[in-house]
Amino acid sequence: MVKLVFLGPPGAGKGTQASLIADFYKVPHISTGDILRSNVAERSPLGIKAKDYMDKGDLVPDQLILDMVKERLENPNAQNGWILDGFPRTVTQAEEFFKKYESEGEEAKSSSSFHVINLQVPDDVLVARLLSRKREDDQEETIRNRLQVYYQQTQPLIEFYQAREQLIIIDGNNPIETVTNAIKQEVDKIT
């Protein structure tokens, strides 16, 4: 059963790889941004609560995001595995997710019930990739600042997963197919 969390800095190819791996293993690629948008659009009870925060310009609280993720993972199409993209983003979110996930049943009690794919790519490559998108907000200084913020927020999260022996590091500085194959090899070792 494939249960993965994808980590990586902006431009590392998380979304691309998560989607390819999800298609290959026939499990849903679950993006927290998509979950949030669909809950708001469907006016679900969780979506209504989230919209209240969003309308005020506030961040949606971790607990609400956790509840949405938990609900999404209970969906029948996620029963045989899933790939989370963009969540958890912080140690607090990871700890809460871990607690919720572990409380869901005996199978989930072991820390190895899901793994974390961390795509590593050198900063200069990330900057070049992001600049090539030619988006208005993708200026080199802005990109480098975003990378610094990402590393500051994510390093404790990486250590959290390392301590639980859940972390799988993948060299993302390769062609898409090479990275996909490296992930598949690692996933095949753990499933």
Curated annotation (Swiss-Prot):
Its main location: cytoplasm. Pfam families: ADK (PF00406). Signal peptide: none annotated. AMP binds at T32, R37, D58, L59, V60, G86, F87, P88, R89, Q93, R135, R146. It catalyses: AMP + ATP = 2 ADP. The keyword Transferase applies. Keywords: ATP-binding, Cytoplasm, Kinase, Nucleotide biosynthesis, Nucleotide-binding, Transferase. The keyword Nucleotide-binding applies. This is Adenylate kinase. ATP binds at G11, A12, G13, K14, G15, T16, R133, N174. One of its GO terms (molecular function) is ATP binding. GO terms for biological process: AMP salvage. Monomer. It is found in: Cytoplasm. Consists of three domains, a large central CORE domain and two small peripheral domains, NMPbind and LID, which undergo movements during catalysis. The LID domain closes over the site of phosphoryl transfer upon ATP binding. Assembling and dissambling the active center during each catalytic cycle provides an effective means to prevent ATP hydrolysis. One of its GO terms (cellular component) is cytoplasm. Catalyzes the reversible transfer of the terminal phosphate group between ATP and AMP. Plays an important role in cellular energy homeostasis and in adenine nucleotide metabolism. Belongs to the adenylate kinase family.
